[in-house]
A protein has these predicted regions:
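Conserved catalytic or metal-liganding residues and their short signature motifs at active sites
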Residues: 1-157, 164-167
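C-terminal soluble interaction/assembly domains
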Residues: 165-181
Length: 181
């Protein structure tokens, strides 16, 4: 669970715990899904503002390989956040980025660097692996398939890339779905 410094400060100053909400943003959630989850759990949370901040008007991000000004999709860290019920969209985005930075500090990117991958590349590949693998045991195999296809310059041709391009998640893809370019 991610407990923001602001929340801790509020508790200390107030002398009692203010009203909070526990909001879980699961791995693999899109920006749209995350905005709906925040809005569902936080009264008055403006999902459209969250999408605008994280999608069209993102803050400066300190991630190697990330092109400033592009969507934060894939960078907003999935976790359970304990937040004030008055949380605003800009603060939600900041909390998720702080969680990303904190977790990236723990990751050894040595092999990625040897393969000329940026931190952003690794995050995108990890997102695809997370979306594609049904169980944890499949992750290394899925990662190997993705890596081999990238190395050979082949199209990925995995469900995760198609699901991302679709407006809504589908449990079962159709032949029409996989024809997407």
């Amino acid at each position: 669970m991610v407990l923001g410094r602001t929340l801790l400060r509020e508790w200390l100053l107030a002398g009692e715990a203010p009203e909070t909400a526990s909001v879980t943003i699961p791995e693999g959630f899109t920006l749209e899904q995350a905005s709906r989850r925040w809005a569902k759990e936080i009264d008055g949370f403006d999902a459209a503002t969250y999408r605008r901040i994280a999608g069209d008007d993102p803050p400066v991000v300190d991630v190697d390989g990330y092109k400033q000004g592009t969507t934060l999709e894939g960078l907003l860290f999935p976790a359970t956040y304990e937040v004030l019920r008055t949380l605003k969209p800009r603060r939600a985005v900041k909390l998720q980025l702080e969680a990303l930075y904190g977790n990236l500090e723990k990751v050894d990117l040595g092999r990625a660097r040897e393969a000329n991958l940026t931190t952003y590349d690794v995050l995108i590949i990890a997102s695809l692996v997370e979306r594609e693998a049904r169980v944890a045991e499949e992750r290394p195999l899925v990662a190997a398939v993705i890596w081999n296809r990238l190395r050979e310059g082949m199209p990925l041709q995995i469900d995760a890339t198609i699901q991302y391009a679709l407006p809504e998640y589908k449990e079962q893809l159709t032949f029409d779905d996989i024809e997407i370019d």
